[in-house]
UniProtKB/Swiss-Prot annotation:
GO cellular component: chloroplast; cytosolic large ribosomal subunit
PANTHER family per UniProt: 50S/60S RIBOSOMAL PROTEIN L14/L23 (PTHR11761), LARGE RIBOSOMAL SUBUNIT PROTEIN UL14M (PTHR11761:SF3)
UniProt keyword Plastid, yes or no: yes
Record text on subunit structure and interactions: Part of the 50S ribosomal subunit.
Protein name: Large ribosomal subunit protein uL14c
Gene encoding the protein: rpl14
InterPro entries named in the record: Ribosomal_uL14 (IPR000218), Ribosomal_uL14_bac-type (IPR005745), Ribosomal_uL14_CS (IPR019972), Ribosomal_uL14_sf (IPR036853)
Keywords: Chloroplast, Plastid, Ribonucleoprotein, Ribosomal protein, RNA-binding, rRNA-binding
Family: Belongs to the universal ribosomal protein uL14 family.
KW Acetylation (keyword) present: no
Function: Binds to 23S rRNA.
GO molecular function list: large ribosomal subunit rRNA binding; structural constituent of ribosome
GO biological process terms, semicolon-separated: translation
Any one Pfam family match given in the protein's UniProt record, by short name: Ribosomal_L14
Amino acid sequence: MIQPKTHLNVADNSGARELMCIRIIGASNHRYAHIGDVIVAVIKEAVPNMPLERSEVIRAVIVRTCKELKRDNGMIIRYDDNAAVVIDQEGNPRGTRVFGAIARELRQLNFTKIVSLAPEVL
């Protein structure tokens, strides 16, 4: 469960290392964001000499959460960290690599480019 002021790791090589959620895109009454939700975030830590800089406002899609995800078949998936992938306005990833495992639910939400870049899909 991601809410405003939550810090997230970045799971790609776009140049950002840590994000802070400032808004959840979608219905205005969403309090928490889950896997597959798009958020507006600010970059809190960035890699030097990269296109993304600290304090830049960007969009990101959540790919891992510490809160467990329950599937229809009864399987429960829980990750060790909260992580997101930086995307542009069209929903394409800004980086060229994705690190770590991501959930299969992203494919159903039309983030197929992120799924194809991921080394492992759970």
